[in-house]
Amino acid sequence: GVSVSHASKKITRATTIFSNTEYENFTEAETIRGNVTQRSQSSDDFTRIVGGENAKPGQFPWQVLLNGKVEAFCGGSIINEKWVVTAAHCIKPDDNITVVAGEYNIQETENTEQKRNVIRIIPYHKYNATINKYNHDIALLELDKPLTLNSYVTPICIANREYTNIFLNFGSGYVSGWGRVFNRGRQASILQYLRVPFVDRATCLRSTKFTIYNNMFCAGFDVGGKDSCEGDSGGPHVTEVEGTSFLTGIISWGEECAIKGKYGVYTRVSWYVNW
């Protein structure tokens, strides 16, 4: 089994992009994903969307990869030719971030990839990492030059607040990413995706001692074994409505990955569509 101290750790879904000096600012309860202690044998296996499957090329054309000091440290979603949305906690001010759109297998060149530099980062104005690293966990990235839109590079649809909320409550979303750990273990080279059921608020609150604010929601499986994980942060949680996918969440955080009785926690996009 998992010891209580280990299971209760809050760990991000970004791979570690912090210098060692910054570790000292974290309480034990906020150990960063990718710096997981050796106490759990299974942490080795949780290096990507857990229990997911390979996407097909162009299946999630809004998905982007963020590269910085660490490759594939987070994901994001294309909003239009010039802007990408991701998780605010993915961003470190001094990191030069490259966005890769049209990516499929990060170890191969498919000639569908488009790389852009990020020239401006706008975290949500109420985001304050020193108070809470995962509250208002959403940020916009402006690209240096527009993406060329095609069947591999397509913006995700965003509905108004009311409809985004309605779609989320349809009950089933898709999450995707190349999540992998910084220190050891396999990485996902091919984009992974997973269908995750929406988890009602009461169940969500009961599952954790950490605060789940109204601008967050839980999704995933009580039995464990399937979840988003390291390096998936910032990537999309989408709901399919009559063949069209809408952005309903941003992959944000979780305690470990795919643990029984724990869920993935996502930023509720409906709160931010009027931003």
UniProtKB/Swiss-Prot annotation:
It catalyses: Selective cleavage of Arg-|-Ile bond in factor X to form factor Xa. InterPro entries: Peptidase_S1_PA, Peptidase_S1_PA_chymotrypsin, Peptidase_S1A, Serine_Proteases_S1, Trypsin_dom, TRYPSIN_HIS, TRYPSIN_SER. GO terms for molecular function: calcium ion binding; endopeptidase activity; serine-type endopeptidase activity. The modification Sulfotyrosine is found at residue 23. Pfam families: Trypsin (PF00089). Its EC number is 3.4.21.22. SMART domains: Tryp_SPc. PROSITE patterns: TRYPSIN_DOM, TRYPSIN_HIS, TRYPSIN_SER. The record marks 13-14, 48-49 as: Cleavage. The modification Phosphothreonine is found at residue 27. Disulfide bonds join 74-90, 204-218, 229-257. Glycans are attached at residues 25, 35, 47, 96, 128. Ca(2+) binds at residues 103, 105, 108, 110, 113. Residues 49-275 form the Peptidase S1 domain. Factor IX is a vitamin K-dependent plasma protein that participates in the intrinsic pathway of blood coagulation by converting factor X to its active form in the presence of Ca(2+) ions, phospholipids, and factor VIIIa. Heterodimer of a light chain and a heavy chain; disulfide-linked. Interacts (inactive and activated) with F11 (activated) in calcium-dependent manner. Interacts with SERPINC1. This is Coagulation factor IX. It comes from Oryctolagus cuniculus (Rabbit). The lineage of its organism: Eukaryota, Metazoa, Chordata, Craniata, Vertebrata.
